[in-house]
Regions:
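Domain-edge interaction signal
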Residues: 1-139
Length: 139
């Protein structure tokens, strides 16, 4: 059964804090997106929450608003959250890989023409839902 995006977000933040590689809210949003995309490509769902097309890419509003007080600063928080090992084995390498990237490179990647964010943002506009099937098909 899928988790809530906020629980996956807390897991990501906790892992990055413990690993001494804290991330910003922008990075968190992109990592959540890459996790969901990888799950969807395997016909699975990491979380049921919907991404919206915002100016700087796909965003889970509930997660964004919880951590927006940090602005562009790193989120250094620890949570006592454990994921099912089947989830962790997929999620951990994504976190470890994507947190190394420049967040603006991830923004550029999600904004590429033809990808899911670009289709929704440039078609319907800001804050519209990006359907999971489109994320699966277009990334």
């Amino acid at each position: 059964m899928p988790y809530k995006a906020i629980d996956i977000a807390k897991y990501i933040i906790n892992k990055c804090t413990i690993d001494k590689h804290p991330i910003s809210n922008l990075q968190l949003q992109k990592i959540l997106y890459y996790i969901q995309k990888d799950f969807l490509k395997s016909d699975l769902i990491a979380f049921n929450d919907e991404f919206e097309a915002w100016q700087f890419g796909p965003v889970i509003p509930e997660v964004y608003y919880l951590y927006c007080v940090f602005g562009a600063l790193s989120i250094r928080m620890k949570y006592n959250i454990i994921l099912n090992s089947d989830y962790a084995i997929i999620i951990n390498p994504i976190i470890e890989n994507k947190r190394q990237l420049n967040p603006w490179d991830m923004v550029e990647d999600t904004h590429m023409p033809g990808k899911a964010w670009a289709q929704i943002y440039n078609g319907l506009g800001n804050h519209n839902v990006i359907p999971k099937q489109l994320i699966k098909a277009r990334g």
